[in-house]
């Protein structure tokens, strides 16, 4: 009996609460409905409807352009109506943008996949190895890759310091930000990723605004990876994609190719870096005379890669471009100058280009490959909101015209599948070989990053999952 009484009491309470909620909703609706502005709007609509009906009866078209124009002019002369419409439009715009942003965030969440080890970053730039990180499942056009090794370079330090953070926030990326180039094996293929199959050995790049490759399981779009050369092990393969893509992008900016590069004089500063080693090999392969600016302990390696001139950097630290300018005054200026992130590159941009370049060199003959803050990272708060709205609007426009919802257009052509296939072909033909420096374990990532950014590094530093 007590239980039955308690049940009836609970039902009665629920009924009373429901009736009270309905009553409050009715009161709120009546208050809004009888508000002065709403009542005035209803009166205007009713008057316009009566006038339209009367005009139909009289045989006059109710939707005459002249009549509509007169009505709009009369409305816009009403200050209260203008203020009400402005508030309505602002509320609709803010609410619509918030709804679209929330929908995009919720729609970007992929289904949870398996757990694996990954390096997660924190706001204080520390990197922690997580043993059970959740990996998103492979969606349409994506592949799930078991990462065997990934590279550590100066771009990782730039990402830890905030490079690409605005784009990462807009894309809803997870916390993993380190690991740029990677090599692994395909474990799962999503719908539409027909170019790859299970078990394919692949390599690829992860930009600073992407999740990063420092995870044992990685989900990426199939257009951002390609099959790696079979002759390369995972360690050597992971050292080449990011550095090779950066080198190809720099040569594309200079519009250099095997047909027009022969006989040109090119200076590569910081040639001991991963991208510097690739540039030296490609330029020497295409017939250019390559001068390198690097520490003395890297001289033999760079000469073996094809360098013809060596500018010694004592101690690896250079505060200005004076050593290179002095060498140019003795041996002659260059057709192009490439500044890499390795030891020997001055921290400041080139100012006296006339002392380094030939008079016939184009204006863009100085290419800086070092990571610098993106424009989206430097915008103040009002402009960052405008950038976010423009970014989402552009994505929606691309989706409406049938270009898809992906963000492949953010990547350079050299870091996507066509550029990676070009690197693989050069390796298979024996024209390009990776320069592997040291190999570390995931728990030693901070040591690996410190070595990769030091003056002692020659080539690319790699971290391998055991």
Each language-model region and where it sits:
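Glycine-rich beta-strand-centered segment in the early N-terminal region that forms part
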Residues: 29, 76-81, 138-151, 165-209
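Short hydrophobic alpha-helical membrane-entry/anchor segments
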Residues: 97-111
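NAD(P)H dinucleotide-binding glycine-rich loop of Rossmann-like/cofactor-binding domains
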Residues: 46, 53, 57-66, 73-74, ...
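Mid-domain Rossmann-like dinucleotide-binding core that forms the NAD(H)/NADP(H) cofactor-binding site
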Residues: 244-316
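C-terminal hydrophobic helical "lid"/dimerization subdomain
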Residues: 7-19, 25, 30-38, 42, ...
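Short Gly/aromatic-enriched secondary-structure transition segments
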Residues: 157-167
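Adenosine-nucleotide cofactor-binding segment
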Residues: 284-354
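Glycine-rich phosphate-binding loop and adjacent beta-alpha segment
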Residues: 347-429
